[in-house]
Amino acid sequence: MDFKDYSWTEPVSDYKSKYPYNQVMETESGHIVEYDDTPGAERIHIAHRNGSFTEWYPDGDRVEKITKDKYTIVMKDDHLYVMGKCLITVQGDAEIYV
């Protein structure tokens, strides 16, 4: 399988923050929490100093980037509904246990 036929790219943040609508808190080690209320460009950005982040865009999109491993633990039911296309790219091994 050629990955170029199934490729996609990480969306780029359309950062249009304007004073005084952007509130940023940065900790001493570099963690960031940002609330941007710039009209038409509202977004929320939460970042760890290691580069992992979650960002919500003005149009409702959300990007989550994790620089190492990710674990999701659901103690009861889990439901996933995708109204459009679902594209999963695994560049390595994949295992599913049922």
List the model feature ranges, each with a label.
Residues 1-98:
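Structural signature for extended repeat/solenoid scaffolds and their inter-repeat hinge/linker regions
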